[in-house]
């Protein structure tokens, strides 16, 4: 069963969440063994040598905490509120809850600022989904957007910390998709980079701030990665729609783009590609019912944190965080102590 990534008329959060949080697949199809079995699953590694990202990442980068979303589950694997933003050390210790939005609300999709001092995220704690920002310890939580008739989702920082790019999806009758918007870090100066003729989801600035990569869906179930200048010009596609690529993220040195292919075609997997669309490389090799994705590089480019789907006793389907080397080797679980964790972002240690 596939769910469209495109929010059509009368957009609902549950429809968008089906792609963002559930990797575009009904959770009921997942009957894989839990994390213990996943750690020993037959996973063919990528190239033996480290990827270009790991080989050339700046030596000054220091890996900090991993931010992630946590959802509660109902029996059978159905999503239920609340969800909140947490952080954890790369070795699985020191889990810390940053948001407390209440039983009927949600906060998630965290993205670290480049200096490791702030996190931008989405939340519906005051009604519809808006963009929020907070300090790395969870203090200073502040709403940045509040326009009626829209859901604001999937925020990401510019490298200099001055701007935030995000998806704005209409909830009005007749709405056709999601705009791509950018604003200042204070929530002012909003302008549109791409209109809602398509659905633009999860954009990311390049490390030098000159380009933006974004997943776009032009109806049906087809999604591809597109590249544009940071001012919205020069739009061009870098992956084939047949990949149904989503959730892109740049390597710290800008040489590769990490992404996930869509599930239900034999399992979802993590790939990388060069910004010019060449050098496509598959890092994981799962087959249904195993799935992984929604991956993020460590600040030094040597590792990747990602979501892995598995079965948990008496709870239905669970999603765990796993870490692997940048070449796809060394896959191992990150023991978060919670059964449903996803949409992670690996931050840099603040100075």
Label each residue range with its predicted role:
Residues 2-3, 39-351:
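Sequence signature of WD/YWTD-type beta-propeller architectures
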């Amino acid at each position: 069963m596939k769910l469209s990534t495109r929010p059509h008329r009368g957009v609902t959060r549950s429809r968008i969440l089906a792609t963002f949080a559930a990797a575009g697949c009904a959770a009921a199809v997942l009957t894989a063994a839990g994390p213990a079995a996943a750690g020993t699953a037959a996973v063919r590694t990528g190239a033996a040598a480290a990827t270009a990202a790991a080989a050339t990442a700046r030596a000054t980068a220091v890996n900090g905490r991993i931010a992630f979303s946590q959802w509660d589950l109902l029996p059978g694997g159905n999503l239920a509120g609340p969800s909140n933003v947490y952080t954890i050390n790369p070795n699985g210790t020191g889990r810390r809850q940053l948001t407390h939005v209440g039983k009927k609300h949600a906060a998630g999709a965290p993205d670290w600022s480049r200096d490791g001092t702030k996190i931008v995220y989405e939340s519906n704690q005051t009604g519809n989904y808006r963009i929020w920002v907070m300090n790395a310890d969870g203090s200073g939580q502040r709403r940045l957007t509040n326009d009626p008739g829209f859901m604001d989702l999937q925020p990401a920082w510019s490298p200099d910390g001055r701007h935030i790019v995000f998806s704005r999806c209409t909830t009005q009758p007749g709405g056709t998709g999601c705009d791509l918007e950018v604003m200042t870090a204070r929530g002012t100066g909003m302008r549109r980079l791409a209109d809602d003729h398509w659905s633009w989801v999860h954009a990311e600035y390049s490390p030098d701030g000159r380009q933006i990569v974004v997943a776009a869906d032009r109806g049906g179930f087809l999604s591809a990665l597109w590249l544009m200048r940071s001012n919205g010009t020069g739009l061009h596609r870098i992956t084939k729609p047949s990949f149904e690529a989503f959730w892109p993220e740049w390597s710290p040195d800008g040489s590769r783009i990490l992404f996930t292919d869509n599930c239900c075609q034999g399992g979802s997997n993590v790939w990388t590609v060069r910004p010019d669309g060449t050098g496509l490389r598959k890092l994981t090799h799962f087959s249904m019912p195993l799935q992984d994705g929604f991956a993020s590089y460590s600040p030094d480019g040597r590792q990747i944190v990602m979501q892995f789907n598995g079965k948990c006793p008496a709870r239905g389907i669970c999603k765990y965080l796993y870490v692997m080397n940048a070449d796809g080797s060394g896959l191992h679980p990150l023991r978060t102590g919670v059964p449903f964790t996803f949409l992670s972002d690996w931050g840099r240690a603040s100075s």
